[in-house]
């Protein structure tokens, strides 16, 4: 069977930490044929069929070894994993429209679902699971929200890995310049959430495969005096068993994920609150698999192969 991964340039991926490369290694161990392509290599022919400039992976050790580029019809692949990192910009949007034309293979995740469910905004479908949240480009509305909740987190809507996140209080001397910068002087909406104090204990990444969670979450603990727990920002990752509240959140969102063909998702949970639903290229598998006293690879094969 032939599997394709659509990824960012492979030389940009970190061999020891990247989830896409971990998935490729897992499938290679099962003697599956694994290929990769970048968005730039995807084409729609005049016949309506899609093709890609692909590279067949030979092995992944301390580096990825692969064959020369060849052009393949996407019909050649049983499953296609779309794992391009945000931001979800015009190029990503165009990729989703192109891939939506392809009906022959199973696409993980659905291109239309990736397009329709922003990783920050999709939590708004579950108001009872989230902290008080404002989405606005209005400086006055944001200031009133900050005044009400005393301490808030500001997030850009189309970014990842903790980039562009600010902690603000009503008396912050930089409040005006921060709001002007983040909203582009009132032209761009941002997300503002009540600060969740449990972030000091960490931010959990829970991987869901076909709506089913791995038995362990990756708890990312922020550095001292830091509110961003992302590993890319220096957070420390340790695995934890899922709590009763984690399972309640998963049960609530599972049917939504399945109905929208979101087969590979990473949700973020702080304390009792759902904070993000990551659908583009969820990470955390390497850290979970390396610490869990069980065969995570077998679970992945059973759910995704």
Functional labels for PLM-detected ranges:
Residues 1-4:
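Extreme N-terminal starter segment of soluble prokaryotic enzymes
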Residues 7, 13-16, 224-225, 241-305:
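ATP-dependent carboxylate activation and anion-phosphoryl transfer catalytic cores
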Residues 9, 84-87, 157-159, 282:
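Short glycine-rich anion-binding loops that position phosphate/pyrophosphate groups of nucleotides
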């Amino acid at each position: 069977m032939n599997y394709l991964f659509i990824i960012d340039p492979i030389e940009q991926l970190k061999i020891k930490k990247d989830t896409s490369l971990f998935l490729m290694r897992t499938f290679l161990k099962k003697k599956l044929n694994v290929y990769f392509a970048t968005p730039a290599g995807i084409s729609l022919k005049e016949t309506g069929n899609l093709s890609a400039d692909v590279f067949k992976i030979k092995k992944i050790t301390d580096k990825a070894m692969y064959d020369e580029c060849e052009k393949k019809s996407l019909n050649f692949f049983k499953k296609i994993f779309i794992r391009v990192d945000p931001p979800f910009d015009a190029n990503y949007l165009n990729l989703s429209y192109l891939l939506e034309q392809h009906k022959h293979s199973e696409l993980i995740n659905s291109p239309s679902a990736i397009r329709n469910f922003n990783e920050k905004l999709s939590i708004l479908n579950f108001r009872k699971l989230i902290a008080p949240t404002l989405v606005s480009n209005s400086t006055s509305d944001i200031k009133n929200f900050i005044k009400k909740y005393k301490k808030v987190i500001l997030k850009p809507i189309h970014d990842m890995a903790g980039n562009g996140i600010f902690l603000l209080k009503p008396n912050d001397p930089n409040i005006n310049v921060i709001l002007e910068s983040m909203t582009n002087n009132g032209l761009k909406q941002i997300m503002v959430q009540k600060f969740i104090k449990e972030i000091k204990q960490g931010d959990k990444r829970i991987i869901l495969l076909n709506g089913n969670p791995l038995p362990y979450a990756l708890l990312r603990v922020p550095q001292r005096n830091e509110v961003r727990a992302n590993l890319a920002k220096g957070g420390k990752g340790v695995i934890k068993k899922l709590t009763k509240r984690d399972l309640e959140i998963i049960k609530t969102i599972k049917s939504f994920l399945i109905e929208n063909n979101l087969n590979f998702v990473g949700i973020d949970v702080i304390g009792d609150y759902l904070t993000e639903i990551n659908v583009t290229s969820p990470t955390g598998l390497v850290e979970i698999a390396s610490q869990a006293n069980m065969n995570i690879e077998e679970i992945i094969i059973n759910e995704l192969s």
